[in-house]
Amino acid sequence: MIADAADSARLSQLPLAEFIFGSTSGMHEVRKILEGALEDDLPVLIEGESGTGKEVVARYLHVHSERAGGPFVRVNCGAISSRLLDGEMFGQDSAASGSVVLAANGTLFLDEIAEMDSALQHKVAHALKTGQVRNGSSVNARIVCATSVDLTGAVSGASPGLSSHFEHRVRLLPLRERKQDIPQLCEYLVEKFARNFGRTAPRLKPQVLDAFQQWNWPGNIRELENWIARIVIFGTEETMGNEFRRQTAGREGVAMARHHALRLNAGRMRRTRRQV
């Protein structure tokens, strides 16, 4: 998947302080790491739960790099079987170009790298370490990887030492760990969707913001985006605010339990896929 030109143009105009904002110490650390990643061409590992914005960060690194004129090629490692993924990345044979070749002079974004089997992870680790692929040719692309699990954790299924090959490693915080940033995020998202949909930007009432800050957002920023988009599109903040409170009332524990269950199930699926 190659980045949309409109998205790239929009991201290229944003300074880092406006792209990654927030007052928590964790967000300050994110900005610090990304500042370093913007100064070189070395591999980057982006960690974070689903919905925290890993791909957007990868795209931001691309459009603010010297490779911005090249392609941004995304490979969803969790959507393809390991056998097909090998060919997708490195080519079926010498005559077939894989994603590594297609990303030449640009950025190769490997999403959910922990979904790969160990053999393919070793190939990626080799490329990260030596800058070459199995046929001896050079990798002429910046490699940015993302994962929703801790690569050093026992349930990740990642090859030992894989994470050590990344010069830059950044963890995007789940929204529940940066609730004080929610009002600022809401303001940004309201303006964004109002501009995209040609609507007047509503001013969110304190009651709505309070309700947003009390919720733990298992879907993270993506879930918040969905609610803000609905408020902007339908133009009924009070109605949507009441709907939000109705849907989330008493569901905090259920939502978080479901979130953790899904993560555990994903780990089991990875182990099963390797055994097949």
Language-model region placement:
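Bacterial C-terminal helix-turn-helix
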Residues: 1, 44, 53-54, 59, ...
